[in-house]
Amino acid sequence: GPASEPPGSVSAGGEEMFVFTRDNLPGLDGSTSTAPLARAMCAVLLGEDLDQVAELVNFSRTTQSFRNLMAGTADLVLAAEPAPEVLAELEGEGRWLLTPFATDALVFVVNRDNPVDGLTADQVRKIYTGEITNWSQVGGEDLEIVPFQRNQGAGSQTMFEKVVMEGAEPMEPPATWTSNSMEGLLNAVREYDNSAAALGYTVYYYANDMEMARGLKVLAIDGVTPSAQAIRAGEYPFLNPYFVSIDRDAPPDSPTRILYDWVLGPAGPTLAAPEG
């Protein structure tokens, strides 16, 4: 039975079992937001603990990870949706499989001292287009809203522009209101001007990480608080898939194709239940 199988043995079609080792594990790359998931995946497949496999998950972020795949320096990418121009490059080459495997949510966070507990999707859009500028307009204190954004090309920024703004042009943020990293953005919202003026976004996976979420409050959107259940049920409004991507010519018996099939199969990872 399964108990006798070595760690990480996965079905490779038919009755064949394939055992992943450090020697045959495909080179992984991806987004900041999928790195925790990839670490959990490596731990399961290699039968090692999370600390041991951390060195195998050295992710170069969404845009760069797809470029690495196209350049041949990564075998399998687990990432947020690529920015439109990167997607165009992938599709132009016609040789990359890009398949959704899990859903994540874009969540909005404020300093925990901010009395506002929720916004509507429309209010969020109006804040980011500059139509709503003060927290008092959405039931909060008389305080200017400081809406942070991520850098262009970041997975969460692409998701923000697609699922939140729906084509509306966000205002050009001052340089001090953008952050080049997820951690930087959360720190900014936590500490900006020692006040509760800031608003920012991250993915559910990160907002669920206790260390990351320290001092922050996640807002309900349209009355729905993001939770694993609300994401799975599709009730929370700001959802987007994560993708797994490989070379479509990877042979059926290659570790890359076997891992791709495993990610998409019933044993594969889901984001709605963060590990640990």
Predicted regions and their residues:
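Exported/periplasmic ABC-transporter solute-binding proteins
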Residues: 1-276
